[in-house]
Amino acid sequence: MIIHFTLNGAPQELTVNPGENVQKLLFNMGMHSVRNSDDGFGFAGSDAIIFNGNIVNASLLIAAQLEKADIRTAESLGKWNELSLVQQAMVDVGVVQSGYNDPAAALIITDLLDRIAAPTREEIDDALSGLFSRDAGWQQYYQVIELAVARKNNPQATIDIAPTFRDDLEVIGKHYPKTDAAKMVQAKPCYVEDRVTADACVIKMLRSPHAHALITHLDVSKAEALPGVVHVITHLNCPDIYYTPGGQSAPEPSPLDRRMFGKKMRHVGDRVAAVVAESEEIALEALKLIDVEYEVLKPVMSIDEAMAEDAPVVHDEPVVYVAGAPDTLEDDNSHAAQRGEHMIINFPIGSRPRKNIAASIHGHIGDMDKGFADADVIIERTYNSTQAQQCPTETHICFTRMDGDRLVIHASTQVPWHLRRQVARLVGMKQHKVHVIKERVGGGFGSKQDILLEEVCAWATCVTGRPVLFRYTREEEFIANTSRHVAKVTVKLGAKKDGRLTAVKMDFRANTGPYGNHSLTVPCNGPALSLPLYPCDNVDFQVTTYYSNICPNGAYQGYGAPKGNFAITMALAELAEQLQIDQLEIIERNRVHEGQELKILGAIGEGKAPTSVPSAASCALEEILRQGREMIQWSSPKPQNGDWHIGRGVAIIMQKSGIPDIDQANCMIKLESDGTFIVHSGGADIGTGLDTVVTKLAAEVLHCPPQDVHVISGDTDHALFDKGAYASSGTCFSGNAARLAAENLREKILFHGAQMLGEPVADVQLATPGVVRGKKGEVSFGDIAHKGETGTGFGSLVGTGSYITPDFAFPYGANFAEVAVNTRTGEIRLDKFYALLDCGTPVNPELALGQIYGATLRAIGHSMSEEIIYDAEGHPLTRDLRSYGAPKIGDIPRDFRAVLVPSDDKVGPFGAKSISEIGVNGAAPAIATAIHDACGIWLREWHFTPEKILTALEKI
């Protein structure tokens, strides 16, 4: 069929299949703003276009409908090198993070302002209601529209976007646009899907329909014979190598319990066969031709089921220890299944697979018996949390190709260096033959710390020699991606009558699902990032992680801390009620203070114990709680309005800034011949603004404009090793490496500048904009670089920095919530939510606020509406965004505020600490304690639903 239509003002004539999806059609025409986030259901809005004057989801259209249509995409906004008014406002406000659907947002807002000169909040909410954003938290979009409206009348108009910090510094703590925001909001090619070549093959995966089963028969011959099928990968022809999908520093503190393909299926969605074909359509057709027979086994779905004496064993294969094998290993292996498969454990992590235990650890300080004996009151409560999904706007995706004899991996990953190491081992190549390019990442939140499809894609390219694309559908995100662990946490508290704690005991049990990636470290963070909030002389913790047959779990932002914090905060609040003490008062009597030793952390480590006892070197909780109390009007009356009851709650929170003694970051900075700089950073910017942090740190040290610094990051050929984007490590680890590299280069510039000026080094200094200034005069960086590169020069000037540390930097914060609960219907209305956070010196204040809003809204979603649900046979019923319950703009609190409360930390660069992860740790307990304050019930399992409210009120 030949169709005629107008695209961004240009007439088009195309021969198409009438039923072709318009999103795919436009994307293939180079309209990279029209993206697919939700399998074409039209929920996410990433595919928004203007169709004959109306905002429409392109995925819901077929090509035949374009006949005589007028189409506008985000490519019509601005010019190739000039942002539109709305795009510029988005960049200036700092709303662009992962950026994946920001072109769609710019188009929708532009259309709104074309129709309504000064839209109300309700009109803004309505216009953006069809857009899904997992990272920005929505609140800053109101600022975007406020700024755009102001600039329509006055192009120089400004609004109050974010506070500034540190008057003694030039660029740190000041506004500066995110370095990659412009290209993302303009939809310039920067994601993996934008790099795919026309000759690329496509992978489609046949997945298990059973939660627990053995493959008894597998025949792929008919699929292999289908024209256009290039290769089929199964357990019969994949590498016989065991690994963990978890992207962690080697040796990994997780069981190596995964084979690329195995005979045993351990969850619905587990891998059976991968078809590599010339097109997606052929690959899907080939999947239907694969003949598989299963022996279906009884699934294990919960922690209690996994603990049962007669529970089915999820991992029944033999175990091999690299070091530290237990005395029981030989006996355990004698009862193992002999299928030619096994599991490897690098070092003891308390694993007992025959008991469905993936990992366990125990630790304590003080004398627990004495602590409880000294108590006037003792309480013990158990708290449960459900499985939650990261829902990155960009689904998991990988594109691999050969470049001569080298394997090139274009990846949407948080861990390019770990990915390279793991894939090289699996495909049998040396690391220098594997080149990982981390493209812009359309949302990660921990899920892209794991290697979930890259190794299959890489193996397919190695076997066939062809470029290969493997992209998850949204359904695969729910059944094959890693999600947040289910947890069951029991807390026992002993306290004096005044509420001061004498003993704290936490039993943290987690459900890791079918594989053990992060099975030690995520649950360990439950006590590690909650117990130190309330230092006590007598503390005991037990962590046990169980295998099951639910869909996989792994890293998710917060990394165990939200579960532990919910339990300890709720238990303390229940203790406060029993003692008739105000919740905020009992927090004040027990909370951590600046400079205090955190002794319990001496007993908790991520694979190894800390070399010293950490302390709260910087902690602004006193000021945070003072401000929060005033903002929420903590002690003011809470009037009842009919069936609606008002309540207020609070939770204090903490996080880390990297993993001391385990992780490392490196950086190199080169002075160019015109006096500008190129930074080669190993860090992985996944939308958090790390490249901007590195830019500003280099500019601050080198006294040059940030515009004179360009960052190349996350590319294993063009940067030095960095552990990656996890554990809130970016600012402290990657940032400190950049600071050290800049300081190293600064000394070289000063030395050669002093020589050129004929002055002692002690008499010269760097000065803005990019000069060495002495008593006799000054010389520019460009002149120094040029002299170095002449035939008689001293060579290119390069600075390097390598950062490791034994020291911790802890950000702190508090969440305050005000809810209204309808005691007749069970409805919960979140009226106010205030997130106050201490991230040391905020390097990028507007981006930091965006990180807080986004993380906090994700936590609100986990608390109020999100959960993965299964039937009795282990089939996940939640398989798309429409049924999952992640919040959109209409779900944010009416009064939603993020506040930066600075402190000065000695570990982070220029006093900075992490910011992006801590925001997810406190919403659940803040909301739950507010619900209790409103209507007197304790909800000990989240998320919170009207049914749970009414059940607790004994109304159903």
UniProtKB/Swiss-Prot annotation:
InterPro entries to which the protein is assigned, alphabetical: 2Fe-2S-bd, 2Fe-2S-bd_dom_sf, Ald_Oxase/Xan_DH_a/b, Ald_Oxase/Xan_DH_a/b_sf, Ald_Oxase/xanthine_DH-like, AldOxase/xan_DH_MoCoBD1, AldOxase/xan_DH_MoCoBD2, AldOxase/xan_DH_Mopterin-bd_sf
Annotated positions binding Mo-molybdopterin: 414, 445, 727
Cofactors, names only: [2Fe-2S] cluster; Mo-molybdopterin
Family annotation (Pfam families): Ald_Xan_dh_C, Fer2_2, MoCoBD_1, MoCoBD_2
Keywords, sorted A to Z: 2Fe-2S, Iron, Iron-sulfur, Metal-binding, Molybdenum, Oxidoreductase, Purine metabolism, Purine salvage
GO molecular function, one term: 2 iron, 2 sulfur cluster binding
EC number: 1.-.-.-
Cofactor-binding details, from the entry: Binds 2 [2Fe-2S] centers.
Keyword Transmembrane: no
A GO biological process held by the record: purine nucleobase metabolic process
Entry keyword Oxidoreductase: yes
Superkingdom, natural source: Bacteria
Alphabetical list of NCBIfam families matching this protein: Se_sel_red_Mo
Protein purpose: Probably has no xanthine dehydrogenase activity; however deletion results in increased adenine sensitivity, suggesting that this protein contributes to the conversion of adenine to guanine nucleotides during purine salvage.
The family this protein is said to belong to: Belongs to the xanthine dehydrogenase family.
Protein known as: Probable hypoxanthine oxidase XdhD
